[in-house]
């Protein structure tokens, strides 16, 4: 996707440019006519020197048309510049594709280390302020409910201490002894009744067949 750009209508073809002008120089020159998206200078494959021809991609076609009317047949650094709307050769999508240069140790323009193309000494119009990097918006992730997982820790000991066996046996013996003492002090179910039990009226069934019951003293 081109993001709404129309290269066939918003790209200016400029020729007869001074060979010494760099990408950053052209960017500064043509930015007065509108938002410049990309500058491409045609260079020799072997020498990497400028051929004096460049393509200036603007954000909209109105800026491109204003540019051609303003600079066509005008002098720039002692040379008469030719400018027109570029003819689409079918490679528009490739032209507007952003290129990433991962080697930041060398200048794109001169190939020297220690600076980038924005501050290259070969820029005739001086240094250009690098564009601000777009901040990536972080998508808010909906936290998922965490499942509680019960972890069982494995013992690192291969065998148990023999002292633990004797200790557990002693505890079990002591517990059994306490339970035995408690049983001795508990009244048996067939033992003599207390005074409270004697005072309670006993229910005595009638000798004849009936659902009624008699209370005995």
Swiss-Prot record:
Residues crossing the lipid bilayer are none
Q: Where does the record place the RRM domain?
A: 10-88
The segment annotated Disordered runs over: 120-217
Gene3D superfamilies from the UniProt entry: 3.30.70.330, Zinc finger, CCHC-type
Q: Zinc-finger as a keyword?
A: yes
Q: Name one GO cellular component term.
A: U12-type spliceosomal complex
Q: Return one GO MF term.
A: RNA binding
Task: Point out residues bearing the modification Phosphoserine.
Answer: 155, 210, 216
Any keyword RNA-binding? yes
**Subunit-structure text:** Component of the U11/U12 snRNPs that are part of the U12-type spliceosome. Interacts with ZRSR1.
Name-wise, this protein is Zinc finger CCHC-type and RNA-binding motif-containing protein 1
